[in-house]
Swiss-Prot record:
Signal peptide: none
NCBIfam families in the record: mtc
Species assigned in the record: Saccharomyces cerevisiae (strain ATCC 204508 / S288c)
UniProt-recorded name of the protein: Sideroflexin FSF1
GO cellular component, one term: mitochondrial inner membrane
């Protein structure tokens, strides 16, 4: 990210107003722009020069060239190390990397082996992306990483295989309804694994609390209630993020298979599935990613009693505090 370039002057977080949903949608669309995968080392070196000039007061205004430089660094470089993130695991590669495993998971008629393979592939990709973009100042131990990985794979495979076995046995449900429920099994598996993974990775925050800050950016204290809200919203965001690509294409494909795709070859149906997933990913993902703001505000009186009555550095009572939701 651009923040990896040192300098005394803070960078603007975004060119858009992140306090509004539309601003967050535009910001999410920008940081996941796949054209940033074409960024070269020469482009990055030039981008660093521009950002450095701004952070040292040599560049006074946020010009279009500044925003492009920031976009290139935000989508390509790790914020802590300043090193280039491996291409498949960058934010700008998010849609393309996930496209392969999503098409695999949503392929109709997968057997047990296929279901297990694609759920494993999806969780492996998630772990690789999280590891490549993780906070390097608080690295996760190998044992923690393996525990979370095993739990996520177990949850996703267990839910997928369990529901694949359960749905055909449901009574008083029409065959068409069973077909639809069967197509939504991958969604249930991915969501379950995502929720398990969030609470495993961030359980320590709930137990110890997270830092909350006043409007000046000064730490007020630590709050377990704020931590639960942050982790809970992150878990919910995993559900929301998965919904467009894991729900809309399967439902449309069921309809198409009863109409224009009826009797067509498996290859044609697979191409149609790929097209549906691609369009949904590129168009709907920013709307899902932008639902929750990264920086959350909450009234101080809704947190622990020991935080009530706190004052800022000017001696004024603090009404609202802010915290980072995390990912």
């Amino acid at each position: 990210m651009a923040s990896s370039v040192p300098g005394p002057i803070d960078l603007p977080e975004s060119r858009y107003d992140l306090s509004t949903y539309w601003g967050r949608i535009r910001h999410c669309a920008e940081i996941s722009d796949p054209t940033m995968l074409l960024t070269t080392e020469k482009d990055l070196a030039h981008a660093r020069e521009i950002i450095s000039a701004y952070r040292h007061g040599e560049l006074k205004e946020t010009t279009p060239e500044f925003w492009r430089a920031k976009k290139q660094l935000d989508s390509t470089v790790h914020p802590d190390t300043g090193k280039t993130v491996l291409l498949p695991f960058r934010m700008s590669s998010n849609v393309l990397s996930n496209l392969v495993v999503t098409v695999g998971m949503l392929t109709p008629g997968l057997g047990t082996a296929g279901t297990v393979f694609w759920q494993w592939a999806n969780q492996s990709l998630n772990v690789a992306v999280n590891s490549a973009n993780a906070n390097k100042s608080h690295p996760m131990s190998t044992s923690q990483l393996l525990t979370n990985y095993a739990a996520a794979v177990t949850a996703s495979c267990g839910v997928a295989l369990g529901l694949n076995n359960l749905v055909p046995r449901l009574k008083n449900i029409s065959p068409h309804s069973k077909l639809i429920l069967g197509r939504l099994v991958p969604f249930a598996a991915v969501v379950s694994a995502g929720i398990v993974n969030v609470f495993l990775m961030r359980g320590n925050e709930i137990r110890k609390g997270i830092s909350v800050f006043d409007s000046n950016g000064d730490e007020v204290g630590k709050s377990k209630k704020a931590a639960f809200m942050a982790v809970g919203e992150t878990a919910l965001s995993r559900v929301i993020n998965a919904t467009p690509t894991m729900v809309i294409p399967p439902l449309i494909l069921v309809r198409l298979q009863r109409g224009v795709l009826k009797g067509k070859s498996l290859g044609v149906q697979t191409l149609a599935n790929l097209g549906l997933i691609s369009v949904t990913m590129f168009s709907a993902l920013p709307f899902a990613l932008g639902i929750f703001p990264q920086r959350q505000a909450i009234h101080l009186n809704k947190l622990e009693p020991e935080l009530h009555g706190k004052k800022d550095k000017d001696g004024k009572p603090i009404e609202k505090v802010y915290f980072n939701r995390g990912i």
